[in-house]
Amino acid sequence: MKRALSRLIAARSGLLGALSAAALGLAATSCEAIRNGANPEMPLWLQRPNSAMQVNYSRKLVAPSRRAGEPYERGQPEIDPVGKRVFTGSSDNGLYALRAANGEQIWRFETTGFVQCAPLYDPVEDVVYFGSNDGAFYKVSAKDGKLRWRFMSNAEVSRRAVLQNGLLYVVNANDTLLALEPATGKIRWSQHRSPATGMEVAGYAGPLLFRGKVYTGFSDGNVVAYDALTGAERWQPVDLAAEAEQTLGEVPQQLDVDTTPVPNMLPTGPVVYVASYAGGVFALDAETGVQVWPNTAVTGVSELTLWREPAHVRRDGGPPEPARSILIASSGTTGLWGLDPETGRELWRREVPSGGVSAPVPISGALMVTASRMGIFLVSPLGGELIDGIHVSDGTSMTPSAYGARAFVMTNGGTFLSLTVASPI
C-alpha cells in the first residue's frame, strides 16, 4: 500500500508537465487564504504549483475478489463533519461508512448491484439514504448500517436524493421522479416520462428543489418543474432539443438532459441552468421555464457547477474586488468551460484528458476535478489553469467531496483517498 502510494505521488511532476502542454495548462491564478476563499493576484501556488494538494492517507477499500466487473467507481462521497464519518458507495455492491480521520471501516451494507449513487446523510435522524443499480433505494442507520427500509424503484438510482419539505425526492434511470415519505419509504407522488430509447448517451439528471418546486431533466430532452408538495406541473415541459433545433437547424441525435439543474438568482430574477447533451447549456426562468439564454457551443455536458467568490480586499492594497460567479460545465467531448452566469458567454475553455472529467468541486478557492483515465486535479476557477495533479494508474471517475480544506474520493482501483488542499498565505 505504501509503495503504491509513493508511486502515485512520485508520478505527480511528470503528469503536471504533460498536462500543462496537452490539456489543462499550468496555473497562472489561484486562491486566497481560506479565511475568505478569494483569488489573489499573486498566489503562493504560482510559485509552488506542485505542493498545493497533499495525500493524507490511502486505504484499499474494494477488494478485487469482491468487484463485480465494473471498472469504474462513480458517485460521490458524503461527509458527516460532526460525526467525522464519510459514506461512499462502491462497485462491490456495498455502501461503506468510514472514519474520516484514517479511513477505517465502521460498517458496510451489501446490496445486489453496484452502488454508484451519491449517498445523502440526514443528521437529524442519523441515517443515510442511497440508491443502487439493483433498482432499490435504501434507508440505513448511519451508526451501524442496519436497514430501516428499502423501496424498489425498478431502475438504477445513481443521483443523490434531496430531503426537503418532509419528503425525499428521488430520480431513477427510467425517467421517474419519486416523492417518498422518509419514515416509511411510501410514495407520496410520482411523475414519469417515456424514455427516449436510443436517443440518450449516458447518465441522467437528479432533482433540484428551489423556490417550492422540484426541477429535473429527462432523456427525451425535456426539463420540467413540479410542485414540490403535490407533484403537479408548474410550467409546461421545456423541450431543449427543440430549442437547439432552432439554433442548429437540425434535431440533435442525443436528446438527453443529463445534468441536475443548478439554481441562481440573477438581477433579472431566479433561473435554473440545465444542459442538453447535444444541444448546449441553457438558462431558464425558474418561474416560467422561458429561455433566458442559450450557449449551443457547449455540448457533451454531463455536469454543471456554479462557483462563487465573495467580495474581498486585494492584498496589494488595490481597489476592492467585487463578488463574482462562474458557471462551470464539464464535458468529455468539448472540455471544461467557464461561462458568464448572466449571459452564457464563454469566459474560458480548457481541453481535458481523454475520457473527460468529473463535476468540479469548490475547495479552498479552487476547483477539484477527477479524470477517468488519469487522476485528480486542482484547477483555477478563473481561467481553468492547472494548479496541481496526482496521477492514478486506474484513473478516477468518482466526483470528490470537500469540507474546508479536506477532500475525499475513491479511485477506479478501489483505493479511498483523503487529501488536503493548502490555501495560499
Language-model region placement:
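Residue-level marker for isolated small/hydroxyl-bearing positions within beta-strands
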Residues: 89, 131, 171, 217, ...
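C-terminal motif of bacterial Sec signal peptides marking the signal peptidase cleavage site
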Residues: 27-30
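Hydrophobic beta-strand positions that form the internal "hydrophobic ladder"
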Residues: 86, 128, 168, 214, ...
